[in-house]
Amino acid sequence: MAKNNLCNLINEFIDTILHMTNKFRVGDIVYVSRSRARLDINAPSALYRSEIVEIRNRSAKIKLLEDVSSFIPTSALVKRLGILVLKIGDFESEDSLLNPLRESLRHYFSLLLSEGEVLYWDVRSLDELSRFWKTQNNHNAITHVILVGHGKSNSIKFGDTWKLSKEINDILNLDGVFPKQFISLCCETGIANFGKMFSQLPVCESLIAPFQSIHGSIASQFCQTYFNYLLLQGKTSGVSFKKARDATPNATSFRRWKNGKLIS
């Protein structure tokens, strides 16, 4: 138990350091949790978009409507925010599982963020995924991709056919696309056969995925809890992941991959 706690602390420290390598400057426009900026949280979006007016060590002040904020850790600031919820249909379970799972996220994000900050898209084939991915005009605005579908240790089901991770990777790996964090709610995609290769893609900043079968309700609750900590409370990805996994019953199968390495 002590060894696991030490590993978690080390991973959280590394995650914070990596987050801070995204350097900020005075004049940068950033997003910050309204609670971190001590603003009224009763707003359409949990985040506040503003300009950095002062930086000191690892903290920054941002411009408010009639004042400036107190110092906020730079680890709580992000320059970009856009979430894509990508449902990968299979015909058989869409009405009973995939659509309800996607809709649970839609309702949650409608409470958390403004409408323009979340995009929803459905595909059933690699061709549809390829057309959608290639025609996105604002790839750099998407920072997080949530995959809703069926998975196993080396593939994801598109329509009625299982497609290997390499086939999916070849489509997503476009030149010049800003790296994104992927949260896969597809069963077993956290296993090394899928997660290791996927997390090495230039388009993948990191991958969060289960290494076992996961119930749809647990997947939904874990995902919502993760984004609660990440966006509403302004925690780092590593801290948000650990807290979401600890807080969600039976969510211990979720793993976090980065650059081909299992980091949590």
Task: Give residue spans per PLM region.
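Intrinsically disordered, low-complexity, charged/polar segments
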Residues: L65-G82
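Active-site-proximal C-terminal subdomain of hydrolase catalytic domains
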Residues: Q181-S264
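Short coil-to-beta transition motif at edge beta-strands of beta-rich domains
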Residues: T21-I41
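A domain-level signal for caspase-like cysteine endopeptidase catalytic cores
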Residues: K79-L147, G151, T161-S165, P179, ...
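Short aromatic-glycine-enriched beta-strand elements
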Residues: R58-K61
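Mixed-charge, Lys/Arg-rich low-complexity intrinsically disordered regions
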Residues: L6-V26
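Active-site microenvironments of hydrolase-like enzyme catalytic domains
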Residues: T143-I156, L201-L207
